[in-house]
């Protein structure tokens, strides 16, 4: 399959965040997440959802640049999503469930390269005299990559129809390795200790992530319940895992229900989903440098997060209600995202402190209400979404024109309208 992708974006100027916290953008260029991709329009071409695979019965092997979405989430995922462009990778996977006496098994093993964005932060002050470094183009990084190898497996036990249990594990090199990559880096998943996280084919350190997930489908009720629990920082040993399971954790939980209103052709589709990436208090005193984040290391591809796209240390919950009839879907959606709480709780925001102290109530939150639409006409599928968003404390900015009180700082609140439209042509 050859399905390339081309992206054009205005990449307009925007105010830089008041402070770049380590959970958002590392000032030392450790985590490749630019606030802005240079000053020109963003134009990129990718091989997209292309692949070459050989199918051998229930198994497939090949090369691919497809996006991978692991986990049960409907709106988000923890370890692998379509937020970043697809990674070019080798894949060995099942193309249909493998039947065993204990139930069915599905899985995928990948090994590939995640690329740098091609932008870095300068070390000196900006031209306007501010202390935040600028994002500048670095063409020498266009060919620099690091290695990622990952696997996911799903078991559907024969004794509990409708239940799926899954596990994922990802290993990647920290920092660019480029031509110094060893063959061992591409198979690090098979020999890296799940507790110590040590070992690699080169001098480059490795990092790892893992998750457990489930999905329970109730066909007679037209409903499902699902969840995922992820770990970003490897444990010292089994004791550490059992004593502090909340360390470096993220979780996702959701519920979906289809309520028939006219036979099998018309439904009300209700979904509720929560994604929590903000770390627990365990992470403040451990090796995440005092920043309560998930994705604390360089888990990015072309400068975009491979996992959930809501941002490090962010939380999201979504409620959607759709009317579905034949080929048409229309409905309402409410979405709340608390962005970059890691920066807030680490004191990395430009608030003017009140007499009471630092104001931790001023979270950077997007509260959005919108409509969804999707309908197919012959070979063409049209879709669209419009969101009216009220943003509180945008970018953690302080508003000097606001009215303060002894207990609260002045947040900068804004409104915006976001419209998304698209179509897919089936050939």
How would you label these PLM feature ranges?
Residues 1-159, 241-249, 262-273, 292-312:
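Outer-membrane beta-barrel channel domains
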Residues 156-427:
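Exposed, low-structure sequence patches enriched in small/polar residues
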């Amino acid at each position: 399959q050859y399905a390339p992708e081309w992206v054009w974006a205005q990449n307009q100027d925007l105010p830089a965040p008041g402070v770049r916290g380590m959970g958002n953008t590392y000032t030392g260029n450790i985590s490749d997440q630019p606030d802005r991709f240079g000053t020109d329009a963003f134009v990129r071409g990718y091989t997209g959802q292309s692949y070459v695979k050989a199918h051998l019965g229930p198994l497939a092997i090949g090369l691919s640049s497809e996006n991978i979405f692991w986990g049960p989430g409907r709106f988000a995922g923890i370890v692998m999503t379509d937020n970043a462009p697809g990674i070019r990778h080798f894949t060995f996977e099942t193309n249909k469930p493998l039947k065993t006496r204990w139930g069915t098994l599905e899985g995928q093993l990948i090994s590939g390269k995640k690329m740098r964005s091609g932008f870095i932060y300068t070390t000196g002050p900006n031209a306007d005299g501010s202390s935040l470094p600028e994002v500048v183009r670095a063409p020498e990084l266009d060919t620099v990559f690091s290695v990622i190898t990952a696997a996911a497996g799903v078991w559907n036990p024969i004794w509990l129809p409708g239940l799926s249990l899954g596990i994922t594990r990802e290993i990647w090199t920290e920092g660019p390795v480029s031509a110094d990559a060893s063959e061992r880096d591409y198979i690090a998943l098979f020999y890296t200790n799940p507790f110590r996280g040590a070992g690699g084919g080169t001098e480059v350190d490795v990092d790892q992530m893992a998750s457990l997930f489930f999905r329970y489908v109730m066909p007679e009720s037209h409903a499902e319940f699902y969840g995922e629990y992820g770990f970003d920082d490897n444990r010292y040993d089994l004791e550490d895992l059992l004593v502090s399971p909340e360390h470096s954790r993220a979780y996702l939980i959701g519920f979906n229900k289809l309520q028939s209103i006219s036979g099998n052709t018309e439904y009300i589709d209700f979904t509720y989903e929560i994604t929590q990436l903000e770390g627990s208090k365990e992470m403040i005193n451990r090796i995440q440098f005092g920043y309560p984040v998930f994705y604390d290391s360089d888990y990015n591809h072309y400068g975009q997060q491979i996992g959930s796209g809501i941002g490090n240390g962010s939380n999201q919950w979504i409620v959607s209600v759709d009317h579905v009839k034949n080929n048409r879907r229309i409905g309402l959606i409410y979405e709340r995202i608390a962005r970059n709480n890691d920066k807030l709780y680490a004191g990395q925001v430009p608030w003017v402190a009140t007499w009471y102290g630092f104001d931790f109530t001023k979270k950077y939150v997007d509260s959005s209400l919108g409509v969804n639409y999707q309908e197919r006409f012959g070979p063409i599928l049209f879709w669209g979404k419009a969101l009216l968003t009220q943003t509180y404390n945008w970018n953690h900015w302080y508003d000097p024109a606001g009215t303060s009180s002894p207990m609260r700082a002045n947040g900068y609140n804004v409104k915006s309208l976001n419209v998304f439209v698209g179509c897919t042509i089936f050939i």
